[in-house]
Amino acid sequence: MSRPESRSGNASTPQGTSVLKADDGGSGQTPGGSTENSVAYRYVAVQQMTSCRDHIEYQLTVREQPKQSRMCGVGEKADRRPIDPAPIVQLRVVTHDRPIRQSDPVGSASVAPPVERRPGQGAAAPQTPGVRRGLPVTTALGDGWEDKAWYLENPYYFMYAMLCNADTDEELHLLNDGKTRYTSGSCVSCLYHLKDIDGSHQGFFVFPDLSIRVEGRYRLKLCLFETIGHSVHHCKSIYSDPFHVYTAKRFPGMEESTRLSKSFAEQGLKVRVRKHPRSRRRGSKRTKDESDASDETPLARHVSPKRARASDVLPMSGLPMSQPIASSRMPRSMDDRFERADYDRTPSMASAYYDVKGAPPSRHAPWEEEEVLRLRESRAWDPMYDAPSALYSHHAREDRVEDRRLPPRDFADGRYMDGDYPPHTRSAAAPLSSMSARAGPSEYSEHVRSVYLRDDPVRSMHGSPHRLSAALPPLPPPLSKTPSHPALVGRGYPESSASLTPAYSRNYPSVPAPAPAPAPMPMRPAPLLSRSYDHIGQQSSGRIYDDYGPRPNVVAHYSGSYDPRDALARGFSPPSPQPGRRSPYASHHPPTQWRSGPPSPSRPSDYHLGRASAVERGYAAARRSPIPSARGIDTPPEAYAGFESNPFPRRSFGVPDAGRPAATYDAPRAPPADLYAPDEGPPSGRLGGIGFAPSSRERLILPPLPVPSPLSAHRGELTPLGTRDRDREAAYIAMPRDRDQGLAPTERYLSPSGYNPRAGELDQRDREWEWECERERERERERKRGPASPEYRRDFAQATMPSKPSSRGHNQPY
């Protein structure tokens, strides 16, 4: 192979020969003697040994063995995971006078470096032509010369790193798919002329960006090549020590960089340097890898704020803290625990929701470093924590305890209360006797979230509570006003009566305002009941907080079980009317109760004139009676016993012996309400006066009732079985009705079995007229059927016999 003479290694060419070349404007002078306008460059010829190559000894030493690596993956998920530490190989070239025998071109990693000979030992100069002269050294193969100026500046040396099996030394190039390499990154390195840690000039091959895709145990085969002309000569190969490639979960972490790597980084080589070992923490989703490098190295990277770990800022402490507040600001009394803490000053419910969701409790104690407090205050807390007047209203509950956690930020309705005292100078209130020590924090959060997270116009926004003190006695019970909120009990107000119930309901979540007058406050219609007798226990008028209290300024929706006539039975019972004024033809007076329902569909003018129909008068009187029979509750054993002797087991029509036992009629009945007594008119205010006058927004608006059903016309009980009863029902539907009674209740108001609302609700004259019409229609049916038996006639006469003869004709209207 022919090469230029300047590139040959013949002895005829002097070792120090150099060719001086200048630009076009210069002369053949040295750079120091050139003119000012000329720039001279000196080119040194690269000398290679094309002959006597069997006299050259290549020594390869692995200065940094690879120990571990993290697999980088395949495809789009692949990333850079370099081998730790980066493999570094040192090269030394020694020439000998005689050819050396290298049976195996692949050497081991541990080769004894050449030793310099003392002066006078061995040959002073190589005797073989073409052998480089230099510093005399001694190696395992004999005496030789090492010319560093020759091979350290040779750019034709390079090294290739390939992956091999750790046990079989099998070379691994491609994966099973046949197109993906085992390694990723740069697997080729040129020769770097660098200083060693002792300051000597040496040649190194460095692989700082070599990654492996698959987990396993491998070796690196490092092959040295030299390019000569248009060909490449393989010089020598070396194997590294075995190392393991881990998965992301099993990777132990990056180790601290060695002194050699740090020295190379200081000289400008692109090597990642870690000053401290990066060990993987348990439970961490991120692995400590080479991406977090030092800022002092050339490959240092700024860590992204999004990828910053809490361990870089927070101290490693195991003290649990729910909120980052100092110990001096912890709540010191039971009442202070339910106030908003002084670091929480945001009244907006939306912001409190996001703060709670986005800021979980910290695991570190905030008093260990001041930087933690600054970070926490800049993230979520209001810096105006020194304002003494920022006091929040707290909502206490009877079952709160001392060892509860701090409530969440959105446990109140976010309103300020004007307070003239700092939150930490108050005296601790005495614990209430009604507090339950077993109540958990979940009950409190459920109570306050469902009750107080609304704008209630009844509760004052700026009402400042009385300041509590240990020396002051508890406040006396108010005479005309009862605290409308359960939180006032914890501030010194006495508890209400024993019938006090929680102000929480799934139907009406707000708190009703109690009546200040001694007269009982009219209540809303009864709620929807699941049993027919559940309304008996709800007639108590001594309750202050109603479970089904009305929501202020909200129109109540229509309910199928609601009857407008229930409003008459909610008030107090007036004195019994005179016997002579029970006639429907007597003079009418305004009613004593102010109606909150809509006008009757049949006669709208009755409510403006103060008129009440006979059905409403009897219904109201019967519902206020303490006797079950007067309220229309039949006795099932007596009602269904002896059907053969009583053809009307469920419709007694006022006869004591027909459908109910006589014992229920021996007790005195409650006097009906005097619906015709003069009244002063509706009260002026909502809570003032005797009656109850709701605003127009609270009037119950009911939809129009459908057409009455034949099965429920003029009464609410179920139709008895039997042919006679069905015929009697048809005759009852055909009879004329009083128009004052309005529309009869429809099928939606059918009461359950055993409940008879018509018992005692009609006037005596109305019942007599009903009996008369029923008897006439029964006679017509009997004539059409034929003669009846004497027993049937006797039973029918006894059951339908009125108490006194009727004073009206057969077809006489009202």
From Swiss-Prot:
Bias (Basic and acidic residues): 407-423, 723-741, 760-796
| Velvet domain boundaries | 53-274
Is the keyword Transcription assigned to this protein? yes
GO cellular component, alphabetical, reads: nucleus
Gene Ontology process terms (BP): sporulation resulting in formation of a cellular spore; trehalose biosynthetic process
- Species of origin: Mycosarcoma maydis
Cross-referenced PANTHER family, in alphabetical order?
SPORE DEVELOPMENT REGULATOR VOSA
The disulfides recorded in the entry are none
Which ranges are annotated Polar residues under compositional bias?
7-18, 800-814
| UniProt subunit comment | Forms a heterodimeric complex with velB; the formation of the VEL2-VOS1 complex is light-dependent.
Q: What is this protein called?
A: Spore development regulator umv1
The alphabetized UniProt keywords are: Nucleus, Sporulation, Transcription, Transcription regulation, Virulence
Pfam families assigned: Velvet
The family annotation for this protein states: Belongs to the velvet family. VosA subfamily.
Subcellular localization is given as:
Nucleus
**Record note on domains:** The N-terminal velvet domain contains a NF-kappa-B-like fold and is involved in DNA-binding.
Gene, per the UniProt record: umv1
